[in-house]
Amino acid sequence: MEDKPKFAFVGNSHMAFWALNVYFPQWECLNYGAPGEGLAYVESFHEDTSDCQVVIQFGSNDIYQLNEENTDDYVERYVKAVLAVPSRKTYLFCIFPRNDYDDYSTAVNKFIQILNRKIHEKLQGTDIVYLDVFNRLLQDGRLNPELTLDDLHLNGKG
């Protein structure tokens, strides 16, 4: 019997709530997603995932602590935290878009797009596989309502 490939999923509620065994029955999946968490959680992540391929996604919960003055420091810490997670191979999802306001504002997603660009640039020259699905999740500058449960978390289509 062949061993199943081993994957560890690290990050926030997007990871925690993903029905991994449903979508990836061919893999051994370890779920280290923690709802409400962000950079501090990934910086303090201490599980030994060195025998796994690791999928990481976080950042949505950090957005409202950020502004133009502290984004570069955040990006430095973000990339350092991702690089510190032990793995056979690391896949990093971009920070996903979100819908925070009833007035159909796209401002938060424009800010997330800037953050994603800076993170992606900082990852150049590393072995991290960056999964930029941001624009695929958007509709008119907002998270596509057909892909979300609650204007933040993705559904099965997402």
Language-model segments: which ranges?
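Charged phosphate-binding loop/patch that engages nucleotide di/tri-phosphates or the phosphate backbone
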Residues: 1, 157-158
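Serine-esterase "nucleophile elbow" of acetyl-processing enzymes
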Residues: 1-53
